[in-house]
Swiss-Prot record:
Any GO BP annotation: translation
Keywords from the named record: Ribonucleoprotein, Ribosomal protein, RNA-binding, rRNA-binding
Subunit structure: Part of the 50S ribosomal subunit. Contacts protein L29, and trigger factor when it is bound to the ribosome.
SUPFAM superfamilies the UniProt entry points to: Ribosomal proteins S24e, L23 and L15e
A Pfam family hit: Ribosomal_L23
HAMAP family, alphabetized: Ribosomal_uL23_B (MF_01369_B)
Family the UniProt entry places it in: Belongs to the universal ribosomal protein uL23 family.
Name of the gene encoding the protein in the UniProt record: rplW
GO terms for cellular component: ribonucleoprotein complex; ribosome
Positions of disulphide bridges: none
Xref: InterPro entries: Nucleotide-bd_a/b_plait_sf (IPR012677), Ribosomal_uL23-like (IPR013025), Ribosomal_uL23/eL15/eS24_sf (IPR012678)
Keyword rRNA-binding: yes
Name assigned to this protein: Large ribosomal subunit protein uL23
Amino acid sequence: MRPAEDIIKRPYITEKSNAEIANGKYTFIVDAKATKTEIRQAVEKLFQVKVLKVNTVNYKGKRKRLGVHEGFRPDWKKAIVKIDTEPKPVTYLTEGGKTATTTKKYKTSIEEFGAAQ
């Protein structure tokens, strides 16, 4: 597997993406070849959060001109990641038949996101 820093390039900050932070949705520009599973693992590793859902969108590069010269902007991929903002404790049975409860082991927001709430 590739390093998480190679998969997540940078946050994608717009008015809409900033509004979605309140709902636990964070938007990133990711490597164009990254899969949803790789994106999930990279976000969980980099930010110590629990990822519930990953949506991706592929964008084609736009055609740009400078006088008679023509070129293309690169293709890119956007990932919208929904994190668990209210983790519930998990209860399970131990070997002795007793019940044990785990507390949350991960964060409920990404403070390093840039223009956070």
